[in-house]
Amino acid sequence: SWQLVLDKRENFRQAFAGFNVERVAKFTSNQRKQLLKNRGIIRNQRKIDAAINNARVMTKMHREGHQLCTVLTTLIPQPIVNHPQQFTNIPTQNRLSRNLAKEFKEIGFQFMGPVTTYSFLEAVGLINDHIEDCPFKYTTT
């Protein structure tokens, strides 16, 4: 569940080099084996391999002069603000996340289906699904 991921966030941060894509992209097979033994993270081999792969895809994009942030903000110039009244009204995916997931797959990303892509867009602030009475609904960073 997403809560499990959030509960282990600091362990993931340590295990994946502070989420530095340049460093993760250079992980060796020995480092990968260490991740599979790390009890502080979710030890799913396919997901660990996907994380390393995705870091490599990102660094390739950077070498080619592309930034994911620029690509996303070109597609989504202003955050999408939804107005759910309760948590059960928050979608897990939408047409945008389905289309982006297809594009991510074509680029070479793994484990970035429509639900994960939607959650990613929420996490980076491009989709605001805070319920209406949430104090963070309209805050900006």
Q: Where are the language model's segments positioned?
A:
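HhH-family (HhH-GPD) DNA N-glycosylase catalytic core used in base-excision repair
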Residues: 1-141
